[in-house]
Amino acid sequence: MVLLPEKEKRKKEGKKVHILKKFIPYYSPYKVVFFLDLICAAVISLIDLAYPQILRTMTKTIFAGSSSVILKALLPIGVALLVMYIIQGLCKYYVSYQGHMMGANMERDMRQQLFDHYEKLSFSYYDQNNSGQMMSKLVSDLFDISEMAHHGPENLFISLIKIIGSFVFLFMINRKLAVPLLVLVFFMILFSYGQNRKMQATFLDNRQKIGDINSSLQDTLAGIRVVQSFANEEIERKKFKHSNHNFLVSKDANYHCMGTFMSGNLFFQGLMYLVTLVFGGFLIAKGQMEVADLAMYALYIGIFISPIQILVELTEMMQKGLSGFRRFLAVVETEPDIVDQKDAKPLEQVQGTVDYENVSFHYSDDDTLVLSDVSFRIEAGKSVALVGPSGSGKTTICSLLPRFYDVTGGRILIDGKDIRSLTLESLRNRIGLVQQDVYLFCGSIRENIAYGKPD
């Protein structure tokens, strides 16, 4: 294990806080639902905390009285408890329904934002990134983010109320027994924190590996005709097997961390029951604790352990969600290479004269010039054919005109106007283009033919 310097640790923690700050604004359109969800979660937790205390009070007062006193008190107590649990049931319905819908709405908003941003990104981004990875971010990552958006704050809030509330009652019942339990909780938190950091790295690797599987699958299925025509099924099978195996290895590391985390927490929970029983029995023997109080202690330990188990599951969910959100941010914070200039104007009243003046170009990941100091003019209304061997730059020349890429030297003019001074939408609307690799969208033949001009 490599120990990170303290400065590096602080840097990583700062990144986590920075990511959470970027995530919080997505709650803004649903803040009313969010706060009502937390209020309902608080009511559910407080009612769970109240029942053992009500039972303890009744055991020491009403149930210690005569049978007539007990019978007289049963009806109002029963009605009060019924009302209490009806309220709890309604709150649970709101949390389960509206809380989940809040997460689903946030998932929809983020998916739309990601899709819209994909459409703005330049060709250079798609040259360097695989569509399978992009699909993984649109589907798998956003589902994990949605689960975190709903369950994260809600479960954390419920757990904190139950943990703090149960410990308050444990101290009220018997302070001596509460102290060793508090020490156990301290060590449990230290253990959980250490394991949590290890799990985060494995979840991020999982996201990457499932993206690799999607990439391999998408490549093979999209090009299945080419694969079969060259009888390359075995080659593609080996490529997919490699990606599939890497995902299994990543999952193995992930499940190892999870197993250590969950088994360790379960062990600490068992120790809490052990301490309660043994030390509680000792206090009863010394006359420092009542038997009824030990029973209440066991109930509150159960209430205390329940949110710890939720927090254990929440840790896994949060790690998946944060890993997915990092990948989401990596895309939406990527700026397109080709954008409108601030003073860009629409292309209007086109005659159609095209000038390439001393145009040079190389791709962003390679300094080798594809075009070098190319100049020519195409008069309006003329038809021109570019003829040359494969790789001579014919497609590149065509791709520069609608600004799929920007020239690295020289300039391109339409009717004397530099195409960089024009808005992208108006420029591309004036250009008809047939790609080398024809792609058919889902829909009718008519819709595909009219794709460039649906009206």
Show the residue positions of the predicted features.
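An intracellular "coupling" helix at the cytosolic face of ABC transporter transmembrane type-1 domains
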Residues: V32, F123-S124, S140-A149, P153, ...
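Transmembrane helix-loop-helix hairpins at lipid-water interfaces of multipass membrane proteins
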Residues: F34-C91, F171-K176, G287-V291, I445
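A hydrophobic transmembrane-helix motif
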Residues: P52, R56, I87, P153-N196, ...
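Cytosolic ends of transmembrane helices, especially the final helix of ABC transmembrane type-1 domains
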Residues: K209, N232, H256, F304-V331
